[in-house]
Curated annotation (Swiss-Prot):
The lineage of its organism: Bacteria, Pseudomonadati, Pseudomonadota. The gene is bphC. Belongs to the extradiol ring-cleavage dioxygenase family. Its EC number is 1.13.11.39. PROSITE patterns: EXTRADIOL_DIOXYGENAS (PS00082), VOC (PS51819). It comes from Pseudomonas sp. (strain KKS102). Fe cation binds at H146, H210, E261. Its cofactor is Fe(2+). This is Biphenyl-2,3-diol 1,2-dioxygenase.
Length: 293
């Protein structure tokens, strides 16, 4: 029994209006009203994929991990009990706020709140209308992209995400942090998406380094690059990754030290996949231009 996909992300931020402008006018998501004090944003037929609420954290507040049905949720509850992982069941108010039929609330070993849920609301009768030129995002069985989790102990995090939640290692990249220093990043999948979560001991005081959204076309990436370049947010130029071979760029969000990766064209994981190790993050490109544009 394992998690099936990443369903949603919730952020607590100091500047909600800046995030609203960023997610709609730059990234192209659709504003979708609110739930409690959180503004909601759509990327597809789901009622929401990203939530932004006011808070001093300026970081990822929670991540929603999806299973297929109530029986799968109960199997995950049993697995958590067997592993000695504390959890609570979301009450009716939280289920209504998240627009799901059931959920379990827990934390990973380093304090990131996780919500394992089933039964998300879908609203096909209200088509997704992007707020900026983008043909759409790749979601469905692969979920809403990925995020890179910053952890102090990668081995401990790996044990939790693989042995308890059922993620599987795709590969490792030894990311150069200096002339003689590298950090191994472990990339984990739970469906055809090359990685839904990556784990790395990056020396930044944030829960995540970045989150990624996958667009439908290469032109979507180009148009988004121009919008975010005009906004002065580009941190890495266009490039293609070695492991998943996504063509993408990186840009600052309104919360310091958290970036978005906007990409297209990754390869997918299937039963023939074999684990590999890479010494570079990019086949080409992804030149850092932080503070230069």
């Amino acid at each position: 029994m394992s998690i099936e996909r990443l369903g949603y992300l919730g952020f607590a931020v100091k500047d909600v209006p800046a995030w609203d402008h960023f997610l709609t006018k730059s990234v192209g998501l659709m504003a979708a009203g609110s739930a409690g004090d959180a503004a909601l944003y759509r990327a597809d037929q789901r009622a929401w994929r990203i939530a932004v609420q006011p808070g001093e954290l300026d970081d990822l507040a929670y991540a929603g991990l999806e299973v297929d049905d109530a029986a799968a949720l109960e199997r995950m509850a049993d697995k958590l009990r067997q592993a000695g992982v504390a959890f609570t069941r979301g009450d009716e108010a939280l289920m209504q706020q998240r627009k799901v039929m059931g959920l379990l609330c827990l934390q990973d070993p380093f304090g990131l709140p996780l919500e394992i849920y089933y039964g998300p609301a879908e609203i096909f009768h209200e088509p997704f209308l992007p707020s900026a030129p983008v043909s759409g995002f790749v979601t469905g069985d692969q979920g809403i992209g990925h995020f890179v989790r910053c952890v102090p102990d990668t081995a401990k995090a790996m044990a939790f995400y693989t042995e308890v939640l059922g993620f599987v290692l795709s590969d490792i990249i030894d990311i150069q942090m200096g002339p003689e220093t590298s950090v191994p990043a472990h990339f984990l999948h739970c469906n055809g998406r090359h990685h839904t979560i990556a784990l790395a001991a990056f020396p930044i005081p944030k829960r995540i380094h970045h989150f990624m959204l996958q667009a439908n076309t290469i032109d979507d990436v180009g148009y988004a690059f121009d919008r975010l370049d005009a906004a002065g947010r580009i941190t890495s130029l266009l490039g293609r990754h070695t492991n998943d071979q996504t063509l993408s760029f990186y840009a600052d969000t309104p919360s310091p030290m958290i970036e978005v990766e906007f990409g297209w064209g990754p390869r997918t994981v299937d039963s023939s996949w074999t684990v590999a190790r890479h010494s570079r993050t990019a086949m080409w490109g992804h030149k850092s231009v932080r503070g230069q544009r």
